[in-house]
């Protein structure tokens, strides 16, 4: 045997013993497993995000609207009515009768007999 062949076989034996060299079948299996895990993770995360966001939005908006509307309506309606009616009454009542300023400026006319 030639010296180069013996060195090559010795090097190959050392690599196999140390575990650095693996057969092509073992390499292919490891690559397939690594690719499958990476593909599953890469596909699962975007799918989970794509499904979760529309569901969260679809559930949150009607709940928020259903909870907010009655509260806002319950608070706004009495306040509007409570504020509008006294203001309207306060504005309408003084203008219904004679102005106190007009009465103070125009003293009553007194006719003298004689």
From Swiss-Prot:
The modification Pyrrolidone carboxylic acid is found at residue 105. Residues 23-104 form a propeptide. Expressed by the venom gland. Residues 82-96 have a biased composition (Low complexity). Residues 22-93 are annotated as: 9 X 8 AA approximate tandem repeats of [AP]-[ILS]-[AP]-A-A-N-A-[DE]. GO terms for cellular component: extracellular region. Its main location: secreted. The keyword Secreted applies. The modification Lysine amide is found at residue 113. Residues 1-22 form the signal peptide. Keywords: Amidation, Pyrrolidone carboxylic acid, Repeat, Secreted, Signal. It is found in: Secreted. Sequence repeats lie at residues 22-29, 30-37, 38-45, 46-53, 54-61, 62-69, 70-77, 78-85, 86-93. Residues 82-114 are annotated as: Disordered. Is a minor component of A.samariensis venom. This is As-peptide 126.
């Amino acid at each position: 045997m030639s010296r180069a062949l013996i060195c090559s076989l010795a090097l190959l034996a050392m690599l196999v013993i140390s575990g650095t060299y693996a057969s092509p079948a073992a390499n292919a299996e490891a690559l397939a497993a690594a690719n499958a895990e990476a593909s599953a993770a890469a596909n699962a995360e975007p799918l989970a995000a794509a499904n979760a966001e529309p569901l969260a939005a679809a559930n949150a908006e009607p709940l928020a609207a259903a909870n907010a509307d009655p509260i806002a309506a319950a608070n706004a309606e009495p306040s509007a009515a409570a504020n509008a009616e006294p203001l309207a009454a306060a504005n309408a009542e003084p203008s219904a009768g004679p102005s106190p300023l007009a009465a103070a400026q125009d003293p009553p006319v007194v006719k003298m007999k004689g």
